[in-house]
């Protein structure tokens, strides 16, 4: 490897941004084809290409950061800023859904019956499955913090246990949310209540799945001795993301499930 006179990472040319963009194109167009023509071919192709891109791009980042030493302190600082800005953009993404919900619920139109929830909508009991989901996510926030402190203290076994528990809680949350959707007395087609409910909680559910996958990758890396007590930004980013998902759920629970019902 050539001598480098600075602490910054000059990234090598990579095909993965291009394959990722093609995968995104296939996913969006494939979803439209699925809706209109009931064909899953394009959507499946997009999913496969996306998974291959994710695997190979992450593999390259792990090589560069863990084995080649490119993730120096200044590079890690840049990655931290990047993750903070990404989470900030996600905050505004969800802010749009909350805005739509409160716009519809604080001044319900005559078409909705002048009340909220709209006439004819049977809401979910906030003190049943939604409350259990809240407890599950809060518990997962505790276990991911346990994992973080274990990494910093060099407690390898405890880190693996805590991460495994966090991932299991994440998948349990997804299962409960899926059952709730299946048994819900209204659909996404039931006016503004149905659309705001399913879009907001659905995108949150997608973020839980992404966060669980992120943590699963961290668990595999921890098992393979990739993290040290000083060098573990991959896990740190996953933990930040998971705490963000927790906080969004608390706002969803209070706004849509409890106040909105």
Swiss-Prot record:
It is a multi-pass membrane protein. Its EC number is 7.1.1.9. GO terms for biological process: mitochondrial electron transport, cytochrome c to oxygen. It is found in: Mitochondrion inner membrane. One of its GO terms (molecular function) is cytochrome-c oxidase activity. Residues 35-40, 106-128, 184-190, 257-261 are mitochondrial intermembrane. Keywords: Membrane, Mitochondrion, Mitochondrion inner membrane, Translocase, Transmembrane, Transmembrane helix. The chain crosses the membrane at residues 16-34, 41-66, 73-105, 129-152, 156-183, 191-223, 233-256. Gene3D superfamilies: 1.10.287.70, Cytochrome c oxidase, subunit III, four-helix bundle (1.20.120.80). Its main location: mitochondrion. The keyword Phosphoprotein does not apply. Residues 1-15, 67-72, 153-155, 224-232 are mitochondrial matrix. InterPro entries: Cyt_c/ubiquinol_Oxase_su3 (IPR024791), Cyt_c_oxase_su3_dom (IPR033945), Cyt_c_oxidase-like_su3 (IPR000298), Cyt_c_oxidase_su3-like_sf (IPR035973), Cyt_c_oxidase_su3_a-hlx (IPR013833). GO terms for cellular component: mitochondrial inner membrane; respiratory chain complex IV. It catalyses: 4 Fe(II)-[cytochrome c] + O2 + 8 H(+)(in) = 4 Fe(III)-[cytochrome c] + 2 H2O + 4 H(+)(out). Component of the cytochrome c oxidase (complex IV, CIV), a multisubunit enzyme composed of 14 subunits. The complex is composed of a catalytic core of 3 subunits MT-CO1, MT-CO2 and MT-CO3, encoded in the mitochondrial DNA, and 11 supernumerary subunits COX4I, COX5A, COX5B, COX6A, COX6B, COX6C, COX7A, COX7B, COX7C, COX8 and NDUFA4, which are encoded in the nuclear genome. Component of the cytochrome c oxidase, the last enzyme in the mitochondrial electron transport chain which drives oxidative phosphorylation. The respiratory chain contains 3 multisubunit complexes succinate dehydrogenase (complex II, CII), ubiquinol-cytochrome c oxidoreductase (cytochrome b-c1 complex, complex III, CIII) and cytochrome c oxidase (complex IV, CIV), that cooperate to transfer electrons derived from NADH and succinate to molecular oxygen, creating an electrochemical gradient over the inner membrane that drives transmembrane transport and the ATP synthase. Belongs to the cytochrome c oxidase subunit 3 family. This is Cytochrome c oxidase subunit 3.
């Amino acid at each position: 490897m050539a001598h480098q006179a600075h602490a910054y990472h000059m990234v090598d040319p990579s095909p993965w941004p291009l394959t990722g963009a093609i995968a995104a194109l296939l996913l969006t167009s494939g979803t439209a084809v699925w809706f209109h023509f009931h064909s899953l071919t394009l959507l499946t192709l997009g999913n496969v290409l996306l998974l291959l891109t994710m695997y190979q791009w992450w593999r390259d980042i792990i090589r560069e950061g863990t084995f080649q030493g490119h993730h120096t302190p200044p590079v890690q600082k840049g990655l931290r800023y990047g993750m903070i800005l990404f989470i900030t953009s996600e905050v505004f993404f969800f802010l749009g859904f909350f805005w739509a919900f409160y716009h519809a619920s604080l001044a319900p139109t005559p078409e909705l019956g002048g009340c909220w929830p709209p006439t004819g909508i049977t809401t979910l009991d906030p003190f049943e499955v939604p409350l259990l989901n809240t407890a599950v996510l809060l518990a997962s926030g505790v276990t991911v913090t346990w994992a973080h402190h274990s990494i910093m203290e060099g407690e390898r076994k405890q880190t693996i246990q805590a991460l495994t528990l966090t991932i299991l809680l994440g998948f349990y949350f997804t299962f409960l949310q899926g059952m709730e959707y299946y048994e819900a007395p209204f659909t996404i087609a039931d006016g503004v209540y149905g659309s705001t409910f399913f879009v907001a909680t659905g995108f949150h559910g997608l973020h839980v799945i992404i966060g669980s996958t992120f943590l699963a990758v961290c668990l595999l890396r921890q098992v393979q001795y990739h993290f040290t007590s000083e060098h573990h930004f991959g896990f740190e980013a996953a933990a930040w993301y998971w705490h963000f998902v927790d906080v969004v759920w608390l706002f969803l629970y209070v706004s849509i499930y409890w106040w909105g019902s």
